[in-house]
Amino acid sequence: CIVGIVTDYVNIWEKPEHLSGITISDPLPAARAALETLKDQVDVTLCIYHGGFERDLATGRVLSATHENVAYRLCQELDFDLLLTGHQHMTVHGQTLCGTFVVQPTDRGQEFLHIEAAVSEAGKRFTSETVPASGACRREWLDEFAGMERGAQDWLDQVVGHLPQPLLPDTP
């Protein structure tokens, strides 16, 4: 089975008019319900999650106290065979976390992950290879969207406020 979920932080960053008619809720209960319904009917369970990991995969140290990323909890609480994530713009090479094989490619289509699965009576085995993207973007596409890109960058560069003191990463 393939279950697709998205971070519920979409509700925070997206304009309400873009979400008209769509309900985006906590991804954990939705994934749990889908998995429970389907897992006995399939050989492999796969969750595709537009979200990332809230903990360091090597140490378990909390990286973020928000609920924007919950992939670590997905692996702890649910038993998907595979979890494909994408949100944090960092590579997670194939590894097993709490019994779930997890991967995450970096941003902007710079790479992709080739995943192979072997299912037998002895169990399930997953491997992955990170493959750098190659080739070049067509010049006409770059030219066609250059104005839109400049507009987006100008908008992102607008000052929205000032602080009385610098806000550094360790500022309480």
Sequence positions of predicted segments:
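A short C-terminal boundary segment appended to hydrolase-like catalytic domains
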Residues: V119-P172
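Acidic, metal/ion-coordinating pockets
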Residues: C1-W141
